[in-house]
């Protein structure tokens, strides 16, 4: 008995942390000692009236409940009152602070986590009384068909919920008909579409065309890395001109637009402003003249010769396919570029300077520290299995294309990588006088030089999405988004790791020491451009990588119908070793090149416009 009394006394003397239910932040610390349970104050706590003792300060209330063994205390009439009272009051403060730039995204998502978990706890009690809460409006949000990227969508979803919007998140790769039917069935106020890859722009255009065809007039918000106000004005607005389509650049802006749309007068005024902006952009686009003229494709091809007379392509030490399975997280950490991580969270600066920014620096350090905890856990529990695959094949340039072979004699063709060439005339301020195509950095047969062509695909592991969904199911959006952000960094680190291994060991054409900052600054020979990005903006070329490397069979990565990679934390690309190879921006191409490319690919007019329309602008 003495031992139990001592244990109780020790427990009482330990600090008890009282958490404010609305914000989930520590507001008081109480050190309870034996003296707290003696004297007049304690005697008063023997009161039997629930109405009286429930009005005491929270510290006194806790003391009384602890001694009396009371596990329930009602200070508000119903669970719904708790949600719509202190919880929503707290989130209103969060929304206001975020909108005013006084609170940063990681803080908002953490507050949303407390809100979600609190509501999840209260929901069974609310359901028992058949109570339903009010909201500022109902929003259906989705990443469009063919696209798997959803970090930005998830952030918008969380911030919307922080502002008391009911959000129906349909996830990724959602067809237009499912979004529309859900919006109708749920009597939605607003639809929000997200997309990262350029084919998603076509899907958004199709979606708005369907909305018009069906006679629907719900406001539609557009967002994502590949979207812009200019594209919305020129391509999307005409598809939904009689209704409302809004481009929103970030989560804060999305909330502002949604809040305004829920007020009929505000909605009309906002749409008028957007229409004026769109029509101004359209007029400017129609009247614009190119700063430099476009060359014919034949003129553009009369340029870079590769300087093959003075250059001998390095012979790989190893050719064929090389697999990398379960690369240790500890190894990949050395290759991480942290700067893009902060941009995901809306924080300023590059690593490590972001920590010293007067606005957001402290929060940048906190979220970075949280990321280190995630990496530590991944190192220990091995729940992610980063994998990659690369291949090196004999190759030669044929015009703007790279033809690949299975044999050193270059007689057995196994595939062709089709290239696009810059057509805009080079100006005096251009980095190079040449109109580049990536095939320029591969020797043709006439040069007499033997050349090779490399390709790769990497992902952090197909297990990532299961872990993310687990956090979401637990109402923990913060760790879900944090894991996705870390996963993206690991995927890029994996790509950097393979490229380093290729240069120094597998192809073995350079002798270099590991230097992470040097890798970030690309202080090495060779490049790894990706299909779908500025130098090679045509996404269907990923199929060649998948076919030759057997990517899906070997490491589980997949391509969607829009050629987005699954899982989202994935990277693929080509390897070039020529010392003059560089990452250039293709820019606008003209119809003569588009038709020539389509002919080489075996496309009809429809396919040409689908996959090259963005490059043709």
Swiss-Prot record:
Limits of the B12-binding domain: 136-272
PROSITE patterns: ADOMET_ACTIVATION, B12_BINDING, B12_BINDING_NTER
Domain B12-binding N-terminal span(s) in chain numbering: 33-134
Keywords: Cobalt, Metal-binding, Repeat, S-adenosyl-L-methionine
Protein name: Uncharacterized protein HI_1042
Residues covered by the AdoMet activation domain: 288-617
Family: Belongs to the vitamin-B12 dependent methionine synthase family.
InterPro entries, A to Z: Cbl-bd_cap (IPR003759), Cobalamin-bd (IPR006158), Cobalamin-bd_sf (IPR036724), HCY_dom_sf (IPR036589), Met_Synthase/Corrinoid (IPR050554), Met_synthase_B12-bd (IPR033706), Meth_synthase_dom (IPR036594), VitB12-dep_Met_synth_activ_dom (IPR004223)
Annotated residues for binding of methylcob(III)alamin: 84, 146-150, 194, 198, 251
Residues the entry annotates as binding S-adenosyl-L-methionine: 337, 528, 583-584
Pfam families the UniProt entry points to: B12-binding, B12-binding_2, Met_synt_B12
Gene Ontology molecular functions: cobalamin binding; metal ion binding; methionine synthase activity
């Amino acid at each position: 008995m003495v031992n139990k009394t001592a244990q109780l006394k020790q427990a009482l003397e330990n600090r008890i942390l009282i958490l404010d239910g609305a914000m989930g932040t520590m507001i008081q610390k109480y050190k309870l000692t034996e003296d707290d349970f003696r004297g007049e104050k304690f005697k008063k706590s023997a009161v039997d009236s629930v109405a009286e003792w429930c009005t005491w300060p929270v510290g006194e209330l806790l003391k009384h409940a602890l001694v009396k063994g009371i596990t329930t205390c009602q200070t508000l009439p119903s669970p719904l009152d708790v949600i719509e009272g202190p919880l929503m009051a707290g989130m209103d403060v969060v929304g206001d602070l975020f909108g005013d730039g006084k609170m940063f995204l990681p803080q908002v998502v953490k507050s949303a986590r407390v809100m979600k978990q609190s509501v999840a706890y209260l929901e069974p009690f609310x359901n028992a009384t058949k109570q339903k809460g009010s909201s500022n409006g109902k929003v259906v949000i989705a990443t469009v068909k063919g696209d798997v990227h959803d970090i930005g969508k998830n952030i918008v979803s969380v911030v919307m919920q922080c502002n008391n919007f009911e959000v129906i998140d349909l996830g990724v790769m959602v067809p237009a008909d499912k979004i529309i039917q859900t919006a109708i069935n749920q009597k939605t106020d607003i639809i929000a579409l997200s997309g990262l890859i350029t084919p998603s722009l076509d899907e958004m255009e199709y979606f708005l065309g369907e909305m018009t065809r069906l006679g629907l007039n719900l406001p539609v918000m557009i967002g994502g890395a590949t979207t812009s106000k200019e594209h919305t004005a020129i391509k999307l607005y005409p598809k939904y001109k009689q209704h409302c389509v809004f481009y929103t650049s970030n989560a804060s802006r999305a909330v502002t637009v949604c809040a305004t749309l829920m007020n009929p007068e505000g909605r009309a005024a906002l749409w008028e402003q957007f229409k004026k902006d769109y029509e101004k952009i359209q007029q400017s686009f129609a009247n614009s003249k190119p700063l430099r003229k476009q060359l014919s494709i034949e003129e553009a091809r009369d340029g870079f010769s590769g300087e093959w007379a003075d250059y001998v392509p390095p012979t790989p030490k190893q050719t064929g396919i090389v697999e990398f399975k379960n690369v240790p997280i500890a190894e990949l950490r050395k290759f991480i570029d942290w700067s893009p991580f902060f941009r995901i969270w809306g924080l300023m600066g590059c690593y490590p300077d972001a920590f010293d920014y007067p606005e957001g620096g402290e929060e940048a350090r906190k979220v970075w520290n949280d990321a280190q905890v995630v990496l530590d856990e991944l190192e220990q529990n091995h729940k992610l299995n980063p994998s990659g695959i690369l291949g090196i094949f004999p190759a030669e340039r044929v015009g703007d294309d790279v033809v690949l072979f299975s044999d050193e004699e270059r007689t057995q063709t196994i595939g062709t990588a089709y290239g696009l060439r810059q057509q805009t005339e080079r100006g005096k301020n251009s980095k190079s006088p040449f109109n580049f195509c990536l095939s320029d950095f591969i020797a043709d047969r006439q040069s007499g030089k033997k050349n090779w062509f490399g390709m790769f695909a990497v992902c952090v592991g197909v297990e990532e999405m299961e872990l993310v969904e687990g956090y979401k199911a637990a109402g923990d959006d913060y760790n879900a988004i944090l894991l996705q952000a870390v996963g993206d960094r690991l995927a890029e680190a994996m790509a950097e790791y393979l490229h380093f291994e290729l240069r120094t060991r597998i192809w073995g054409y350079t002798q270099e020491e590991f230097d992470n900052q040097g890798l970030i600054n690309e202080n090495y020979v060779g490049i790894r451009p990706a299909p779908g990005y500025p130098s090679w903006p045509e996404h269907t070329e990923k199929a060649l990588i998948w076919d030759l490397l057997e990517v899906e069979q070997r490491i589980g990565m997949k391509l969607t119908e829009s050629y987005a990679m699954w899982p989202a934390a994935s990277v693929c690309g080509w390897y070039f070793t020529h010392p003059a190879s560089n990452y250039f921006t293709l820019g606008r191409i003209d119809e003569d090149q588009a038709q020539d490319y389509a002919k080489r690919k075996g496309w009809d007019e429809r396919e040409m416009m689908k996959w090259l329309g963005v490059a043709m602008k």
